[in-house]
Swiss-Prot record:
PANTHER family: PYRIDOXAL 5'-PHOSPHATE SYNTHASE SUBUNIT SNZ1-RELATED. It comes from Streptomyces coelicolor (strain ATCC BAA-471 / A3(2) / M145). GO terms for molecular function: amine-lyase activity; pyridoxal 5'-phosphate synthase (glutamine hydrolysing) activity. One of its GO terms (biological process) is amino acid metabolic process. The active site is at K90 (schiff-base intermediate with d-ribose 5-phosphate). Pathway: Cofactor biosynthesis; pyridoxal 5'-phosphate biosynthesis. Catalyzes the formation of pyridoxal 5'-phosphate from ribose 5-phosphate (RBP), glyceraldehyde 3-phosphate (G3P) and ammonia. The ammonia is provided by the PdxT subunit. Can also use ribulose 5-phosphate and dihydroxyacetone phosphate as substrates, resulting from enzyme-catalyzed isomerization of RBP and G3P, respectively. This is Pyridoxal 5'-phosphate synthase subunit PdxS. The gene is pdxS. It holds the Pfam family SOR_SNZ. D-glyceraldehyde 3-phosphate binds at R174. It catalyses: aldehydo-D-ribose 5-phosphate + D-glyceraldehyde 3-phosphate + L-glutamine = pyridoxal 5'-phosphate + L-glutamate + phosphate + 3 H2O + H(+).
Length: 303
C-alpha cells in the first residue's frame, strides 16, 4: 500500500476482529528488539515469536538523547527479509504518516511507542485507518482502554524501557490487572461511574467487567532482563513479554535469548527457570528507576 493516499482513494482498513486475531497468535511468546538482520536471526533461532526492528534499542535511545524517530526503511526491510517470523516496527505517538510508511513496507505490526519522541502531545494515531494491527503501551486500565478505543489490537504494560529494571513493568501490570478485578461484579450504575473515572468508553468498560480481562492480548514490557523477570511477568498475568535492551546488551545474547524464551514458556516451573538462568554471562547494566527525572521517564508519554 502506498503511504500517499489520493483524495479519491479511501485507505485500506482491516476489521478489529482480524487484527486482534493476528495478535492472539503471539500469546505465550517473547518479542525481541533487534537492530540488524543478524540479531533478528539470533532471536528467531532462540524461539522469539516476533522481532521489533529499530535502529537503537531503548538503552541507547536513553543514553544518546535527542529526538528518536521511526527507523530507516532499508533497515526495516533488511530485517523483514532475514526472518520468517513476524516483524514489528515503531512509530512515534500521533505520527500517522510514519505509521503509513511502516504499513507500506509490509511490517506485520506497528508499535505506536512512547520510546520514540512523541509527534503529537494531544492525539494518538487513528489505528482503525490501517490494515496493519497496532501495539500500544499503557500504565493503567484507562490508558489501555483509550488505546483500544482508537483501534489497538494489543496492549503492553509499559514498564520503563531501557533500564533493565523490572519494577515499573510489575507496577503497571499489577495496576491494570487490579483495576480489571475491581470492575468484576459492578452494576451498570457503577460501570458508568467507572467509565467516567477511567476516561474510557462505557461499552469497553462493560466488556472488560464481563470478560474479566482486556478484549485484546496483554503483554508486558520495559525492564525485563533475566529469565526470572520474564517468568515473573507471566505469573502476574502477562500473556507474553517484550524484551528490548535486556538481550543484546548482555554478555551472551544468543544464550540469554533462548533462556528467556524457555522461562516465558515454562513460567510456572521454578526448576526449569533455574536451569535456564545458569551461566548466562553478565546481564545488562541496570538503572535505578527512582533516579530518573520525570522528563526521562518514557512511561509518562501518552495520554
Amino acid at each position: 500500500m502506498s503511504s500517499t493516499l489520493s483524495e479519491n482513494q479511501a485507505p485500506e482498513t482491516g476489521t478489529a476482529r482480524v487484527k486482534r486475531g493476528m495478535a492472539e497468535q503471539l500469546k505465550g511468546g517473547v518479542i525481541m528488539d533487534v537492530v540488524t538482520p543478524e540479531q533478528a536471526k539470533i532471536a528467531e533461532d532462540a524461539g522469539a515469536v516476533a522481532v521489533m526492528a529499530l535502529e537503537r534499542v531503548p538503552a541507547d535511545i536513553r543514553k544518546d538523547g535527542g529526538v528518536a524517530r521511526m527507523s530507516d526503511p532499508d533497515m526495516i526491510e533488511g530485517i523483514i527479509g532475514a526472518v520468517s517470523i513476524p516483524v514489528m516496527a515503531k512509530s512515534r505517538i500521533g505520527h500517522f504518516v510514519e505509521a503509513q510508511v511502516l504499513q507500506s513496507l509490509g511490517v506485520d505490526y506497528i508499535d505506536e511507542s512512547e520510546v520514540l519522541t512523541p509527534a503529537d502531545e494531544v492525539n494518538h494515531s487513528d489505528k482503525f485507518a490501517f490494515t496493519t494491527p497496532f501495539v500500544c503501551g499503557a500504565t493503567n486500565l484507562g490508558e489501555a482502554l483509550r488505546r483500544i478505543a482508537e483501534g489497538a489490537a494489543m496492549i503492553r504494560s509499559k514498564g520503563e524501557a531501557g533500564t533493565g529494571n523490572v519494577v515499573e513493568a510489575v507496577r503497571h501490570l499489577r495496576q491494570i490487572k487490579n483495576e480489571i478485578a475491581r470492575l468484576r461484579g459492578y452494576d451498570n450504575n457503577e460501570l458508568y461511574a467507572a467509565a467516567k473515572e477511567l476516561r474510557a468508553p462505557y461499552e469497553l468498560v462493560k466488556e472488560v467487567s464481563e470478560l474479566g480481562r482486556l478484549p485484546v492480548v496483554l503483554f508486558s514490557a520495559g525492564g525485563v532482563a533475566t529469565p526470572a523477570d520474564a517468568a515473573l511477568m507471566r505469573q502476574l498475568g502477562a500473556e507474553g513479554v517484550f524484551v528490548g535492551s535486556g538481550i543484546f546488551k548482555s554478555g551472551d545474547p544468543a544464550k540469554r535469548a533462548a533462556a528467556i524464551v524457555k522461562a516465558t514458556t515454562f513460567y510456572d516451573d521454578p526448576k526449569i527457570i533455574a536451569d535456564a538462568s545458569r551461566n548466562l554471562g553478565e546481564a545488562m547494566v541496570g538503572i535505578n528507576c527512582d533516579t530518573l527525572p520525570e522528563t526521562e521517564r518514557y512511561a509518562n508519554r501518552g495520554w
